[in-house]
Amino acid sequence: MTRTLTIFICVLAFLSCPANAQSGFRIMSYNVENLFDTDDNPDKNDNDFLPSGNHHWTRGRYYHKLQQIAKVISAAGEWNTPALVALCEVENDSVLIHLLNRTPLKQQQYRYCMTHGSDTRGINTALLYQRDQFGYIGHREHSVVFTRKNHKHTRNLLHVW
């Protein structure tokens, strides 16, 4: 009887273990709400986010925001940071380079791709990916076309494969 019970417990324990222990990964979407640098881009309407603009956007406030964004991304992953992070409202490549190289996210070896659309303020979407967990092949952006005449222009979609 003891032997049968022992075998039963062993079989039960064996069946409760997954057959293929695959490691999962996290995906995150984050609207960073106007992640602008402090440099004037004469081709875009980014004047509100200059030191002399309506938001009095200084380097100190900019770098503080980068640190806060890095904290949120790190905390979202619990033990491991998310493998993929979709970002909304990013101004340009510079802010992503600063985010990935001047914050603790530097240790995670993220890479990025982003749209470079025609938004008048220069707001784009981007994807951060950990190259050891995501095999980036390429990306393309798609403009959204509305059929109504009174539509508002929107940002391009980012398609990554």
Regions flagged by a language model, labelled:
Residues 10, 21-55, 130-161:
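Active-site regions of metal-assisted phosphoester/phosphodiester hydrolases
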Residues 1, 14, 83, 124-126:
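Generic secretory/membrane-interface signal
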Residues 1-23:
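Bacterial Sec-dependent N-terminal signal peptides
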